[in-house]
């Protein structure tokens, strides 16, 4: 599903633990790390897509997490030209994302990367909240910054993070 401007609707997921760290996952077959994310299917709400992607990519169910916040609007990024397929119909030029901040309420033993075929990720780790900004691929960096800035303000009071490397 691609909108009239060429953007694919998508959800981004920032999953935090009790220590204020976030789940950071490595794409299978690549040396690229990112937050879990995925497309919104036709007829699906962003929240429904969030739970489907969470299950497919990291094995978590709705009862394993709590939604803390979501971005007010859609955040967009354009794909580099090398990733655009001009012969597809319609042509996708980027993604528009609704971001969610979640808190893990279950044990990490519920995190499973092998539930989809093929799996999206082959490794994961907990990292400090702002760490991903310096690590994510360049074309996603601005969206990550905007989502993280908006959502960090909505974290529970006991969660504090240093905004280093912004």
From Swiss-Prot:
Task: Give the UniProt keywords, A-Z.
Answer: Hydrolase
Q: What is the lineage of its organism?
A: Bacteria, Pseudomonadati, Pseudomonadota, Gammaproteobacteria, Moraxellales
Q: Is the keyword Cell cycle assigned to this protein?
A: no
Map motif Nudix box onto the chain.
Answer: 38-59
Q: Indicate the family of this protein.
A: Belongs to the Nudix hydrolase family. RppH subfamily.
Q: Which PANTHER family match?
A: ADP-RIBOSE PYROPHOSPHATASE (PTHR43736), DIHYDRONEOPTERIN TRIPHOSPHATE DIPHOSPHATASE (PTHR43736:SF1)
| Class in the EC hierarchy, top level | hydrolase
Whose protein is this, by species? Acinetobacter baylyi (strain ATCC 33305 / BD413 / ADP1)
Task: Write down the EC number.
Answer: 3.6.1.-
Give the domain of life: Bacteria
**Protein known as:** RNA pyrophosphohydrolase
Q: Which GO terms describe its molecular function?
A: pyrophosphatase activity
This chain's function reads: Accelerates the degradation of transcripts by removing pyrophosphate from the 5'-end of triphosphorylated RNA, leading to a more labile monophosphorylated state that can stimulate subsequent ribonuclease cleavage.
Query: Hydrolase: present as a keyword of the record?
Result: yes
